[in-house]
Regions:
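Conserved ABC ATPase signature
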Residues: 51-55, 59
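ABC nucleotide-binding domain "signature" region
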Residues: 30-42
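Hydrophobic anchor residue at the start of the ABC signature
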Residues: 65
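Helix N-cap at the start of a conserved alpha-helix in ABC-type nucleotide-binding domains
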Residues: 87-89
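Catalytic Walker B motif of ABC-type/P-loop ATPase nucleotide-binding domains
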Residues: 76-79
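A short, proline-enriched helix->beta-strand linker immediately N-terminal to the Walker B motif
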Residues: 70-74
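Short coil-to-helix segment of the ABC ATPase nucleotide-binding domain corresponding to the Q-loop/switch region
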Residues: 11-18
Length: 144
């Protein structure tokens, strides 16, 4: 999941999610079932047939998350998924990622937003100059 959702412009929300399953050769009935389940998870059922340019930034991020989950990854990598979102939408996206984590998927998120780190009290690994500068099981963000 990237800071700028890389959605397929000529495909609607449903098709953007289903695409990840199509390229893996998933049977059509399974594509339909899984895509609908993912639309439920990210709360985009009402936007299933909207195109990326008809979605807000937060909605686009949720499509990107759903598409990333389509093939049941063990780990979900998120690079600044809230970077271009307002604080309220950021909270919604982080809450969705926490829900995904509680369901069993490891979520690794890079962020510069100290409020996200401090509010969640999750494991924090700080990188400086390409090396681990800190690794705390329930750390908080410290400005240095």
């Amino acid at each position: 999941v990237t800071q700028e959702p890389q959605l397929l412009e000529k495909r609607n929300t449903y098709e953007n999610i289903a695409f990840a399953l199509e390229v893996m050769g998933t049977p059509n009935d399974e594509i339909e079932s899984k895509t609908n389940t993912l639309l439920d998870l990210v709360e985009l059922n009402e936007n299933a047939f909207k195109y990326p340019d008809q979605l807000s930034g937060g909605e686009q991020t949720r499509v990107s998350i759903a598409r990333s989950l389509a093939n049941n990854p063990l780990v979900l990598l998120c690079d600044e998924p809230t970077g271009n979102l307002d604080p309220e939408l950021s909270i919604q996206i982080v809450s969705l990622l926490e829900k995904i984590n509680r369901a069993g998927t490891t979520v690794v998120m890079a962020t510069h937003d100290s409020s996200i780190v401090n509010r969640r009290k999750k494991r924090v690994i700080e990188l400086a100059n390409g090396k681990i500068a800190r690794d705390e099981s329930e750390g908080s963000y410290i400005l240095r």
